């Protein structure tokens, strides 16, 4: 400032009088002088002003940048002791974020010597429930491998915390399912956190937990969206707001928001701002170009417009505001405020942590994502309606014997359920279904001529539907009347040891495990694109894909979920996969030179997807197997894929991957095509485990729609708002499936 010398002399006098040292610092607002213009823009955005009327709220010059040590010594040459004191002060500032010591909650290991002992005990108990006739060798090997890695990394308390939350939800009859990379874990499956059977899937545990990364695992659990709040309240009751809080998320400027805010600062009209921003998308600064402005009718040579475009490009990626994460909970052993910065949430008695998930990952702080999913609410309603109006659909021939077992007071929490005991008594070895549990009995009866099924259904489809005599009367929405008890099937985790018998009886509700697996009629329905309301495959794009892909197995649904995404489409993966699936194109797997590996190394990675990389795990395996990446480097590639739109660092792996594949004998053009496909994932690529978790819900919702379209329509209507379709479209679809939908009637209708 012009009066800097006078101010310095005055401050020196005050310091001498108070006998405290003088410290020299700069008023740093940006790192380099050329950023002064962007600082002015940010100031105007904060103050809701334009540059023309901001006045003295803006800095007078560009001196608020980070100056070098030599420049600071020159500016404070009249007070060298202030420079020396600044250095002395900095030398004493020894705090590092590495000193923050996060400790997992430990109270859930009561009764066990260590958290690892508790984890193994709970997982082994779950394995016995999942595999009542013996744990398969493949699963046993996976469990032992995961136990060892979890123990070495000290993550057992994290798994126990998630297990405790999921166990609470199931005890309350709340449908829940883990997804994401956690579905790679056999331990999570046995704990009941995820539903992807490791015996049937070839999943990569290191995608979830890796010794090279040494980062805490991140488990996402979906709960019924209408009852997620019950789970959140349980977390706060158990740990208190002093130990539990929601993580933050940093909202950054994208192309549209940057153009809008900078345009307002420069006084552009709303029409001009709308025209410039309306056709922008994503994070790319390159999209805000002179060519773009010219296409929408502006003159890029206009000085004001050129300045707007340049500053908008600089603003992209800057933090805009701090928001609350959709469901990421941080839970600690000690107090939150001793570990992380916190603030009050909008809701009373709740806390928000002022760090986002990337900050938490860097510091290895536990985060559990407690998410809401509308389809789980719909499926819960569907199962309740089936239990109430179609009890025979899941009835077992041994129903009476099960009831006698119940009356005998069998402790279902002690291990085996009554249905398992009776199956063992009859020595009928059951086949495990896609959900890893005992399949439900076959549906009884036939279907008479007045079938609710569409006329194009095949006879074998009709034969498995319940007969009209077995169906209860149902009119428009959820009907009244007393609910019937389930026929011997129970949620394997619905009770706690201290629950009363009455509470246990209230919790006898059907869960997704009773849905029969791999019914051809369900796949035929999906192949006709008859998927209105079905989870994940109800969009127009999915309906277009279904008749082309024609799913026939559960893994086909995994492919269906993953392939209709911007990543595979942009990476030119969809059409090659379809052509190969239909036999129109030969599947060819290039081989490395004999000195560098077996000829079928890529077939082992891409065989299931016909040579097309559709999943993040496959991209990681290609990098490791074909390009010589270390596992840690492959994980960095995954992270670059996940943040491609925002950060754009995937380009740094191009040369390493292409050169690595070429050095091992792969054709360079093939290596370039592989990289382009991987780059096409952007942040839209699915991990296979995530797609498998969603495919389970696809099949469950499709089965209910196929067999009981009235139940499915009622559940969808009572779960609104959710999905792609309005209630009128859901009603019309039900009518097209032969369902009579009546008007609201005070004698029959009920509320939910």
Segment roles from a protein language model:
Residues 403, 411, 423, 433, ...:
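Intrinsic-disorder-associated, low-complexity terminal segments enriched in Asp/Asn/His/Tyr and depleted
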Residues 37-113, 117:
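Active-site or pore-adjacent capping/gating segments
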Residues 12, 16, 91, 170, ...:
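Anion (oxyanion) recognition and catalysis
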Residues 1-33, 74-77, 96, 121, ...:
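Domain-core and long-helix interface of multi-subunit machines
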Residues 62-63, 101, 109-394, 446, ...:
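Noncatalytic, beta-rich nucleic-acid-contacting surfaces in large DNA/RNA-processing enzymes
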Residues 126, 399-401, 410-413, 444-448, ...:
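Glycine-biased, low-complexity coil/linker segments
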Residues 407, 422, 427, 450-451, ...:
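Cationic, low-complexity basic patches in intrinsically disordered or flexible, solvent-exposed regions
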């Amino acid at each position: 400032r012009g009066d800097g010398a006078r101010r310095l002399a005055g401050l020196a006098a005050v310091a001498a009088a108070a006998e405290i040292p003088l410290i020299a610092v700069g008023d740093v607002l940006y790192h380099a002088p050329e950023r002064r213009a962007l600082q002015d823009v940010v100031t105007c955005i904060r103050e809701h002003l334009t540059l023309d009327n901001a006045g003295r709220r803006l800095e007078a010059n560009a001196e608020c940048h980070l100056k070098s040590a030599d420049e600071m010594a020159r500016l404070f040459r009249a007070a060298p002791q202030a420079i020396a004191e600044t250095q002395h002060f900095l030398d004493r500032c020894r705090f590092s974020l590495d000193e923050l010591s996060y400790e997992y909650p430990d109270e859930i290991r009561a009764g066990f010597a260590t958290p690892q002992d508790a984890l193994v005990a709970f997982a082994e108990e779950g394995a016995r429930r999942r595999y009542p006739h013996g744990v398969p060798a493949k699963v046993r090997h996976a469990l032992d491998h995961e136990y060892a890695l979890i123990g070495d990394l000290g993550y057992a308390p994290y798994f126990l915390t998630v297990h405790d939350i999921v166990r609470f939800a199931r005890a309350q009859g709340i449908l829940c399912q883990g997804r994401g990379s956690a579905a790679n874990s056999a331990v999570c499956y046995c704990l009941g956190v995820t539903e992807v059977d490791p015996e049937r899937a070839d999943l990569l545990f290191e995608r979830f937990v890796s010794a090279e990364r040494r980062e805490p695992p991140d488990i996402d659990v979906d709960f019924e969206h209408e009852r997620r709040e019950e789970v959140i309240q349980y977390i706060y009751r158990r740990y208190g707001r002093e130990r539990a809080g929601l993580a933050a998320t940093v909202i950054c400027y994208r192309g549209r928001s940057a153009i809008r805010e900078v345009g307002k600062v420069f006084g552009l009209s709303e029409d001009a701002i709308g025209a410039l921003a309306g056709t922008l998308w994503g994070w790319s600064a390159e999209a805000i170009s002179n060519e773009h402005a010219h296409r929408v009718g502006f003159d890029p040579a206009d000085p004001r417009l050129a300045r707007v475009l340049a500053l908008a490009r600089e603003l992209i990626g800057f933090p805009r505001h701090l928001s609350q994460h959709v469901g990421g909970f941080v839970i600690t052993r000690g107090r939150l405020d001793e570990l992380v910065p916190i603030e009050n949430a909008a809701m009373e008695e709740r806390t928000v942590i002022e760090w986002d998930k990337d900050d938490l990952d860097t510091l290895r702080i536990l985060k559990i994502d407690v998410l809401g999913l509308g389809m789980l609410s719909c499926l819960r309603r569907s199962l309740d309606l089936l239990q109430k109006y179609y009890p025979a659909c899941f009835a077992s021939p041994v129903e009476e014997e099960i009831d006698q077992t119940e009356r005998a007071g069998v402790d279902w929490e002690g291990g085996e359920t009554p249905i398992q005991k009776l199956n063992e008594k009859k020595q009928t070895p059951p086949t495990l279904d896609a959900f890893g549990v005992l399949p439900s009995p076959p549906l009884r009866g036939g279907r008479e001529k007045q079938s609710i099924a569409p006329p194009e259904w095949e006879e074998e489809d009709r034969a498995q539907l319940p007969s009209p005599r077995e169906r209860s009367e149902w009119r428009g929405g959820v009907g009244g009347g007393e609910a019937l008890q389930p026929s011997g099937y129970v949620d394997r985790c619905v009770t706690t040891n201290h629950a009363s018998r009455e509470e246990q009886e209230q919790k006898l509700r059907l869960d997704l495990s009773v849905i029969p697996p791999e019914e051809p009629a369900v796949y035929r329905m999906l192949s006709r694109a008859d998927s209105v309301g079905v989870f994940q495959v109800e969009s127009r794009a999915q309906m277009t894909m279904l008749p082309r892909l024609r799913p026939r197995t559960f893994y086909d649904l995994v492919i269906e979920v993953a392939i209709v995404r911007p990543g595979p489409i942009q990476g030119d993966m969809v059409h090659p996969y379809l052509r190969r699936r239909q036999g129109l194109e030969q599947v060819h797997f290039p081989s490395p030179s004999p000195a560098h590996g077996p000829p079928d190394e890529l077939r082992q990675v891409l065989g299931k997807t016909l040579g097309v990389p559709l999943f993040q795990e496959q991209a990681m395996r290609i990098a490791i197997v074909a390009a010589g990446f270390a596992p840690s480097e492959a994980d960095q590639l995954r992270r670059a894929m996940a943040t491609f739109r925002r950060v754009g660092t995937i380009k740094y792996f191009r040369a390493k991957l292409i050169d690595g594949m070429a050095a091992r004998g792969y054709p360079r053009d093939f290596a370039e095509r592989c990289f382009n496909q991987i780059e096409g994932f952007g942040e839209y690529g699915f991990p296979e485990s995530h797609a498998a978790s969603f495919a389970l819900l696809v099949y469950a919702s499709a089965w209910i729609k196929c067999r009981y379209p009235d139940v499915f329509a009622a559940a969808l209507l009572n779960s609104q708002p959710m999905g792609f379709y309005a209630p009128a479209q859901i009603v019309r679809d039900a009518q097209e499936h032969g369902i009579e939908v009546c008007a609201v009637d005070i004698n029959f209708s009920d509320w939910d």
